Regions:
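Histidine-rich, glycine-flanked metal-binding segment
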Residues: 1-6
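Hydrophobic residues within beta-strands of alpha/beta enzymes
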Residues: 69-70, 151, 210, 238
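Histidine-centered catalytic micro-motifs
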Residues: 7-19, 150-159
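Metal-coordinating catalytic core of metallo-dependent amide/deamination hydrolases
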Residues: 78-196
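Active-site metal-binding loops of divalent metal-dependent hydrolases
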Residues: 14, 72, 79, 155, ...
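Active-site-adjacent C-terminal substructures of enzyme catalytic domains
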Residues: 132, 182-245
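Alpha-helical scaffold segments that flank or form the walls of functional sites
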Residues: 22-87, 107-116
Length: 245
């Protein structure tokens, strides 16, 4: 009847509960959008909000042929309940930064939600270098060593992010993450737009996934990831939507 039976899509990077910000402040670059618009709103969200906002996203995913997502957000208890109630598979990822969550909570969540429900699992992660101080990143690297686990974060999404990291540490975010031991057991870098050849060699060395979000990068005019070069180098790739806002 003209139908196609195939495996479902998997959304490799998203912030599902950000359905609250859809079509909100669409004309701003990333940093202004985050700090001036999104972060102040996120500070007001409750666990109940996250449940309903996530469940809306999960139902939209299912309608679009997406059966699982890799979800970086807050209130994992609410995210997990929304996933189970919707019959949707979710891999939750830590979103630690300077003003939300902590390495201690990340440790707790890792143990709790990897033994919670067959549809739910949890990975170590933090938001990004520019929102997370060195001591927090070092503590997360220690957790990666403790659990022999991969670590995931936003990386090299914009040119200003990379230049800011070079100004703070004298190296790119990718080089910093390697120096700290965050990728000793692999992981993933969300966006990976402004990456150098040296950065890509680090990805290849540690088996780090470049998790691409072309639609989000186009909307924010962040740039275009060097996908052809990544493919030529044999770097593992995955594709995500980024947040629905």
């Amino acid at each position: 009847n003209g139908n196609l039976l195939m495996p479902a899509f998997k959304n490799a990077h998203t912030h599902s509960a950000m359905t609250f910000g859809r079509s909100f402040s669409d004309d701003l670059p990333l940093q202004s959008w985050l700090y001036d618009k999104i972060f102040p709103l996120e500070a007001k969200l409750t666990a109940e909000d996250i449940y309903h906002l996530s469940r809306l996203a999960f139902l939209e995913y299912l309608e679009s042929g997406i059966s699982a997502c890799f979800d970086m957000y807050y209130f994992p208890e609410a995210m997990a309940k929304a996933a189970v109630d919707a019959g949707f598979r979710t891999v939750m990822c830590g979103a630690v930064n300077n003003f939300k969550e902590s390495p201690a909570l990340l440790d707790e969540y890792y143990n709790t939600y990897n033994n919670h429900h067959p549809l739910v699992s949890y990975q170590l992660g933090f938001h990004a270098e520019y929102t997370t101080n060195r001591s927090i990143m070092e503590a997360i690297a220690a957790l990666a060593e403790k659990y022999k686990a991969p670590v995931y974060m936003h990386a090299s999404e914009t040119e200003s992010e990379v230049q800011g990291c070079i100004g703070r540490y004298g190296m790119t975010p990718t080089a910093l993450f390697e120096q700290l031991g965050l990728w000793n057991y692999g992981g993933g870098a969300f966006h990976s737009v402004w990456v150098s050849n040296e950065d890509l060699n680090i990805y290849k060395k540690h088996g780090v996934y470049a998790v691409l979000n072309a639609g989000s990068n186009a909307k924010l005019a962040s740039g275009i990831a060097p996908v052809e070069k990544m493919l030529q180098m044999g770097i593992p790739l995955a594709v995500g939507t980024d947040g629905p806002s």
